[in-house]
C-alpha cells in the first residue's frame, strides 16, 4: 500500500511539474528569423559600400518596438571590401534608420547597410551577415 501511495505522489509531482513548464510563456524577445532572411546584393559607389539584405524580424513583445540594425562582416574587412566590420542600416541622408516592429508578429524589411569602401571590389561571400538588433528607447 505504501508503494502505491508513493507512486501516486511521485506521479502527481511529475505531472504538476510538466504542466507548470508547459504553461510558462516564452521570454519576450526580438530576433532575426534566419530562415526568412537573406543577403540580396552589394554595390560600390565612390567611397561607400551598400550591402542589401531582406531581413525578417520576430517581435514577441506585447507592444510595438523600434529598433536599429547593424551588420557584422569581418571577412569583408579581411578581403579589402570594407574598412570597418560593423556597418549600420542608414537612410539616404546618412542618418541611422529605425524600424518599427509590430507586436507579436514577423516584420520583414529590405535593408541597406552602408560602410566605407576599402578599395577591393570583391565580396567575401553571399551569406546573410550577423545582424545586431538594438532597441531604441
Model-predicted segments: where are they?
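Short acidic, flexible loop segments centered on an aromatic residue
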Residues: 62-84
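C-terminal motif of bacterial Sec signal peptides marking the signal peptidase cleavage site
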Residues: 19-23
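Bacterial N-terminal signal peptides that target proteins for export
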Residues: 2-10
Amino acid at each position: 500500500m505504501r508503494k502505491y501511495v508513493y507512486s501516486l505522489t511521485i506521479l502527481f509531482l511529475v505531472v504538476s511539474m510538466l504542466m507548470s513548464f508547459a504553461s510558462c510563456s516564452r521570454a519576450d524577445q526580438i530576433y532575426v528569423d534566419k530562415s526568412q532572411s537573406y543577403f540580396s546584393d552589394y554595390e560600390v559607389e565612390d567611397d561607400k559600400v551598400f550591402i542589401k539584405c531582406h531581413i525578417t524580424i520576430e517581435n514577441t513583445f506585447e507592444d510595438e518596438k523600434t529598433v536599429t540594425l547593424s551588420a557584422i562582416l569581418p571577412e569583408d574587412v579581411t578581403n579589402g571590401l570594407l574598412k570597418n566590420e560593423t556597418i549600420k542600416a542608414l537612410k539616404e541622408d546618412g542618418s541611422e534608420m529605425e524600424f518599427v516592429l509590430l507586436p507579436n508578429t514577423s516584420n520583414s524589411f529590405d535593408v541597406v547597410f552602408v560602410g566605407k569602401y576599402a578599395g577591393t571590389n570583391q565580396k567575401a561571400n553571399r551569406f546573410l551577415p550577423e545582424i545586431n538588433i538594438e532597441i531604441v528607447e
